[in-house]
Amino acid sequence: MKKLSIILIGLFFCMSLQAQLRLTLGRVIEMAADSSLTAFRNQNMYLAGYWEYRTYQANRLPSLTLNLTPARYYRYITQRYDSGQDIDVYREQQMFSASGGLNISQNFDLTGGTFYIDTDLDYMRNFGSQTYTQYSSVPLRIGYQQNLLGYNPFRWERKIEPLKYEKVKKQYIYNTEQMSEEAVSYFFELALAQAELELAQENLISTDTLYKIGVQRQKIAAISQADLLTLRLDHVNAQNTLQNAEIAVKRAMFSLATFLNIDKDTDITLDLPGKPTNKTITVEEALAKAEENNPTYLEQEQNVLEAEQSLDRAKMEARFNASVNASVGFNQVADKLSEAYRHPLRQDLVQFTVSIPLVDWGVRRGRVNMAKNNLNVVRTSADQERQSVEKEIIVTVSDFNIQQRLIASAEEALDLAIQAHEQTRQRFIIGRADVNSLTLSLNRQQEAQKNYIQALRNYWQDYYKIRRLTLHDFESGFSLSDKFDYAVGMYR
């Protein structure tokens, strides 16, 4: 029984150790990039864009296609001409056939045409009063087809698809930095809650001690009954504040654990980052890096190109369309397979088609006008988005440079508030300070603690926001894309 108790105690101790986690801000950001659901979503969004670009590249390469019809059987009544009777008659016909072909094609971006090489073989066997077998072969055929005056999608894909993939890569890093911002928010939400809990615990002990001192002093008439009741009220309020602080910590801890995709019952303790080193970022430098890296600029450029593509398509479809298909090759037909490839005959094809819209009651012209108006809207929206990004950068950089001074000021205020409260507390104990002064000094200390943590929070949120908007690490001086590993979604 004793051994069992020891084992159970040991297991409980191990479980307690496993459920505890001490984290820094940097570690929280690393864990978010490694295991959070947001990171998983970001990676799959990138992979979707990656494979879309790979598909575009594959479409630019020669394609090899095998077309097969292994078996086809017909049995039906058909109308035929009987030369002996000089009349049309209905006859039953049975036929089995099979076919196969191999095709190689290559698209040309510049012209919008397709070059192809193919070979075909067909087999046919008729059943009935006259059974016969035939093979038809095309040993080789080389051809080219394209629209002469129509819309060329290949030319536009060549402009848009590489830009889309570059935007996808930048967007992946952008989303990762946005996730870092979320991590900062969750981190300091819990840090602030834990700091308030710690203050509430200290305040409860302090108010309890002061109330007991007040009871003793009231007995000798050193303080009034009203002051004693105020001390009692402070103690009761401290108990309520402690309970609310415990609830806030549990909520903040649960939110952080959920975001990091770890056990929701994990007991997380945070280490606040120290005072950051002074780093001034100029607005001009931030704007230059944003124009170079921010995916919003690439997205707007893509939107304009796609609108221009739609306008080009509408204009081309409003005109007459002409296409050409030309091929040269060989073919043969025979009763035996081997003879179907002997002495092939020349096969030539030149086909020119024209489609001219005569009357459409303004449909095509309407499509062109809609495409023009849409292009104007897209260009205006692009300018607005750029201005919005620039405004956000200017405001954030200005706030960031100010936050560094605010942290130093908040830290100094916290030190002074702690010293002032301790001195007021000691003066109250010896009867040289009243209850109002003591309460005021405690409130100032709590407010200074909140302001300091909030200053740290604002600084790091602005720091990672600038990283997100510019995709540049101003502390190390390198572009984030240079250090980003797209395979794992983390920095090398």
List PLM regions with ranges.
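Amphipathic alpha-helical coiled-coil scaffold segments and their short linker/junction regions
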Residues: 29-33, 84-89, 223, 227-228, ...
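Amphipathic alpha-helical coiled-coil segments
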Residues: 41-56, 175, 179-200, 216, ...
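Acidic, low-complexity, intrinsically disordered peripheral segments
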Residues: 65, 72-77, 264, 276, ...
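A glycine-/polar-enriched beta->alpha junction
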Residues: 30, 34-40, 47-62, 101-134, ...
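Periplasmic alpha-helical coiled-coil/stalk elements that build and connect Gram-negative outer-membrane
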Residues: 159-163, 167-289, 399, 403, ...
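Bacterial Sec-dependent N-terminal signal peptides
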Residues: 1-25
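Small/polar, glycine/serine/threonine/aspartate-rich low-complexity segments that form flexible
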Residues: 68-142, 270-280, 312, 325-356, ...
